[in-house]
A protein has these predicted regions:
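N-terminal cysteine/histidine-rich coordination modules
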Residues: 1-61
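Hydrophobic beta-strand residues in large extracellular and virion-surface proteins
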Residues: 6-9, 28, 92-94, 101, ...
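Anionic N-terminal interaction surfaces
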Residues: 41-109
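Phosphoinositide-binding peripheral membrane targeting modules
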Residues: 100-143
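Secondary-structure transition/turn motif
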Residues: 31, 104-109, 155-158
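Short, aromatic- and cysteine-enriched interfacial helices/patches
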Residues: 16, 110-113, 184, 235-236
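Acidic, Ser/Thr- and proline-rich intrinsically disordered linker/docking segments
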Residues: 130-255
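Glycine-centered tight beta-turn/hairpin loop motif at sheet-sheet or coil-to-beta transitions
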Residues: 85-89, 115-117, 156-160
Length: 255
């Protein structure tokens, strides 16, 4: 049986004990592979992705235990975490009071009472996608059924930047979507459509002005930044306060 070496810890691995990566390097399943969350796709990852994710989990688990977990049972409504349970894997916890959210995987010990929680922690402001998705699967009886998911996508994130939360159906997804839309101040209702349209049109005009300036050579960095910021605010909401809250905490956890 062919033997290889774990690119992280140097352990000798074979086709059974090793995990092949997209760049044809290997990591050991027993130690290094277990440091990754189940939602992380190791097959399509290269070594840099894996090491970034392992560091992400180490840092995230520490922040979860020290900052967010104590808020899970808080009696203060302003501090209490919002939880989106996921029957297909880790749960998503959102903490507007800290500007952070966490994807938490619970691992249970076999034959021993107890469990451990491992987490990736993100700035809420970096959440740039929460889209509805369905998947046709066959159940244990061989009958086809539909699974419903919310696909979560984070910007400016190394390691695990996207994962799926299984929801009970489209109504449950709509509730999740409304929660984040409200949190970000994104208006999607018919009553606010005119106001929202005006904001987006102003953003587009700012971008158009930037394009015109680029064409005649008069575009400066300040104007370009304002144009990009205008589109972001109109489409994704103003996240300035969430960024400030999150960065104040993350400064204590360099990584």
């Amino acid at each position: 049986m062919a033997k290889n070496t774990c690119a992280i810890c140097g352990a000798e691995v074979n086709l059974i004990t090793g995990q092949a990566l997209a760049d044809k390097q290997y990591i050991c399943r027993k130690v290094c592979g277990k440091k990754c969350l189940k939602a992380f796709d190791k097959i399509s990852a290269v070594l840099g992705d894996v090491t970034a994710h392992i560091a992400q989990v180490e840092r995230g688990t520490k922040i979860w235990n020290e900052v967010l977990l104590p808020l899970k049972k808080s009696k203060n409504k302003e501090e209490k975490l919002k939880c989106f349970n996921n029957s297909a894997g880790g749960d998503l916890y959102v903490s507007p009071s800290t500007g952070l959210c966490a994807y938490v995987e619970t691992r249970y010990k076999i034959f021993i009472f107890g469990k451990s929680e491992h987490a990736c922690v993100y700035r809420i402001a970096d959440l740039y996608g929460y889209e509805y998705e369905t998947e046709k699967v066959k159940n244990s009886e061989g009958k086809e059924e539909t699974k419903h998911y919310c696909v979560i996508l984070f910007n400016n994130t190394a390691g695990l930047y996207t994962f799926r939360i299984q929801v009970s159906g489209q109504k449950a997804f709509a509730e999740l979507e409304k929660y984040f839309d409200t949190l970000f101040g994104i208006q999607k209702t018919l009553g606010n459509m005119a106001n929202n349209w005006k904001n987006q049109m102003n953003a587009i005009k700012a971008a158009a002005g930037a394009v015109k300036s680029a064409a005649d050579g008069s575009l400066d960095e300040f104007q370009a930044a304002n144009a990009a910021g205008a589109i972001d605010t109109a489409v994704f909401g103003d996240r300035t306060e969430l960024i400030a809250k999150a960065d104040a905490i993350l400064a204590n956890y360099p990584g």
